Amino acid sequence: MNLEVTLAGKTFKNPVTTASGTFGSGAEYEQFVDLAALGAVTTKGVANVPWEGNPTPRVAETYGGMLNAVGLQNPGIDLFCKRDIPHLKEKGASIIVNVCGRSTSDYVEVVERLADEPVDLLEINVSCPNVKEGGIAFGQNPDALYEITKAIKAK
């Protein structure tokens, strides 16, 4: 059965992708999931520089589930391109990179860095609710969102 789907001009073998933030950059789950069998791996957010994220504790159990406030901890674009992209490609995965930033120029820097990398799509993260500066404001401010989108599309 052919399960191929096309999204933004890119064809994926099936519509099953990981959710950003829940799957790291794939290596954390490859003992449980064949990365090549997925339509794509959507990575955890990647910024222009490494982010430490929020201090612990970052997860709290509640009656209805769990809350998390990881704070977009990530290795930064340079290490991501050196380590994570080659690993995902070696495993046969299609790659959707979740791009995060604290300013329009941060987003543009990451997008420019990824321009020559073998990634399939970019997902622009402007709505992560656990970042004190940056992300939440962009998603709630139409003018800021427009500026980020315009700057990225210009690249």
Positions of PLM-derived features:
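Flavin-dependent oxidoreductase catalytic cores
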Residues: 1-155
